[in-house]
Amino acid sequence: AFGTSPDFDANGIPDECQGIVKYCTCPAPLGPCGNNDPNAGCINSTGVGALFTPSGSSSVAADDLVLTGSQLPLNKIGVMLSGNMSVGPLPFGDGLRCAGGLVARWPAKFTGATGTVTYGPGLSAYSAATWPPAKQLLPGTIWHFQFWFRDPPGPCSNGFNLTDAVVVFFGP
């Protein structure tokens, strides 16, 4: 994309035209300790990087957005972060942080026996019932999502890591 429109996935299409975009992978040389994964977050103790995959839409009225974390260490706790700005990518623990600005922390979840977590549907309704307007998922707002998780045996020995990120341009 040219001009002032963001293009986080570098595909030449302005992100606001796509609604939902994945970004913040961990290509070389960005991994904090060489734990690079160009297709996901930085490598964790499973041997691969964790993914945060969107499904559904960016429509607040439909409220059908689902964000699924996968390739996560088994039976570990984590939280989804949403921020109104993109930062970095910044080295953070064994991974990269890309969700920043005004940050909201969603309810903690365990990765369970499958190494997965799911948030949604109903994210817009939850945000409206829980947070002040500045942190709500409203039409016309842009939010960046990542899942932060504990990973004590992780490759860099920092004890935690993050998935790649998803940016959502919320519409009516």
Locations of regions flagged by a protein language model:
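Amphipathic alpha-helical interaction elements
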Residues: 5-6, 147
